[in-house]
Amino acid sequence: MGLEISYSNGFVLDKNLEVKLNKAFEVISAEEDLSQYSINIRIVNDKEMMDLNRKFRKKDSSTNVLSFTNNDISKSMTGNLGDIAINHDFVKRESIEQGKTFDDHIIHMLIHGIYHIPVSYTHLRAHETRED
């Protein structure tokens, strides 16, 4: 299956970056046995992310990434695991602050978002994994 990428407010990622995002999903899909599934990715701006964060998390602020699991019965028929919103404005600022390239950081946000969907990944699990 794969990633379905959509955009808000006219912002569009470079095609090479889209290829990298799809490759990252392919690698995770192979490792986590998710190749029969898809995930929707929406690239948003600060305003749209703030609206999503307010609506779903009751937080009046923007953030870099949000994940939404598809708990609908249609998941078994569509193979869609859920949605990830990635805030290009926030990621751009963070990449500069952290001395990373935009491409590397947005790929990191995709990976982070994916692990919050299908495998009930938590920050605690990430910490435990790093210590192994």
Would you name each region that the model predicts?
Residues 112:
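Nucleotide phosphate-binding/pyrophosphate-handling subdomain across enzymes
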